[in-house]
């Protein structure tokens, strides 16, 4: 039995030795990490004793020399950095609060590694440079160029709504007509200038700014009050123009109605006179016919008509013996 046990133990020992060797090798692989992985959208930079020996931007699994080669990975995708809101005076010395955001990417990974090395350093440097560029560009341009991108507000023909050319607008209350300033560049053009100014300073860092976007522009309290007052003034002018146009339309329609009224009254008067003439002619014919048949009755009838017209307005006391009343008291 003892001899058989020694034989089994002799066969197990080589297996254990092999397992130990394999375990040591696997542990060495894990500890030394001779492999590195480049994912899509990444750039790898390999250094040896601090010196750059190569770069690689192709996705895949690669081998390096442990302890000798160090792998630094960076993204090739767009990154974003938000600037700090800052109060800046425009060319007119009107203070506004400007807040921007920017998109950037690593253009030259070697320059980036040698000059900055980390994202934290890159964010800090980019933010400082862009904030400085924003200040430089804003201070030499007018407020209208900062807040507007086109002259569309000037080119729009408001007279289409009012049937009155804008150049002929007049206001009864002496209000001054406000005009929008014509911009020379516009906000989008200023954003491109800021990007270009920032790129001129960042080219030595292997960084390129893709674009700068104005997230927000806030007026100071004084400027905001001035803008609101101008808006109210413009709205009042448009309202006054509406009223003036309405009054003009009203006068035009009243004139037409008055002319139509006069025309209708004239036609009605002519028709009434015609009918009256016909009636008088017929009455005269009837009177003539009646007179021919009974002159005495005709005289009596005409006297009654005279009494009816004259007596109600007579305030004097008249005698019944007068010739005037012969038809009343003689019969």
Swiss-Prot record:
Entries under Pfam families matching the protein: Band_7
Principal subcellular localization: membrane
UniProt KW Transmembrane helix keyword: yes
Cellular-component GO terms for this entry: membrane
Keywords, in A-Z order: Membrane, Transmembrane, Transmembrane helix
Regions crossing the membrane: 18-38
Gene3D superfamilies with a match to the protein in the record: Band 7 domain
InterPro entries noted in UniProt: Band_7 (IPR001107), Band_7/SPFH_dom_sf (IPR036013), HflC (IPR010200)
SMART domains for the chain: PHB (SM00244)
Listed SUPFAM superfamilies: Band 7/SPFH domain
Topology in membrane: Single-pass membrane protein
Subunit structure: HflC and HflK may interact to form a multimeric complex.
Family of the protein in this entry: Belongs to the band 7/mec-2 family. HflC subfamily.
Known role: HflC and HflK could regulate a protease.
Descriptive protein name: Protein HflC
Organism the protein comes from: Treponema pallidum (strain Nichols)
Gene: hflC
